[in-house]
């Protein structure tokens, strides 16, 4: 009887607690990269929060969504990719250059899709502005300028979240933790995927911090890192 009880308890631990056990190791595994990302969020939270508040978005959820990107952010790599985007993307579009840029690692194609979807949504009228979505260098140059500042990326992040709530009304009925898991997956994988596809993608380990992925590269569930960040920030004061 005792042995059966122990086996049952161990089974429950593995089934229900595995995500907690493994997520608790993220801070140790990422080391200084985690600490630096955490410090960056803490130092900029006061500047970012008014932007998220403007769009009615929970800053804690927004910051958790992009936290994995802050962990693997590289100054020198971003400088090279940003320069390429500014030169090649502006003149030739996302088919010519579509590198992720900025602290939140946003691609021009992502911004294009957000611009277009925003313009077609009821939110554009509610907030009183639209984006220039013409297929020309002026529109692309303006888009790159928005992506080139942390404030601009915060606005794109907030708009992404509002559009996701609009597209998936039942998302708001989930717990905050579940919302983070869903939104982080959509942000990292494909924000235009269906509800079922995004739920399925939550299980995929595709996130890594290596410059180039090899067979030795360790991969993680992007959304679980976001959830860990959210829970840590929710349970402690900033």
What are these model-predicted stretches?
Residues 24-238:
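Catalytic glycan-binding domains that act on GlcNAc-containing polysaccharides
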Residues 9-17:
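Bacterial N-terminal signal peptides
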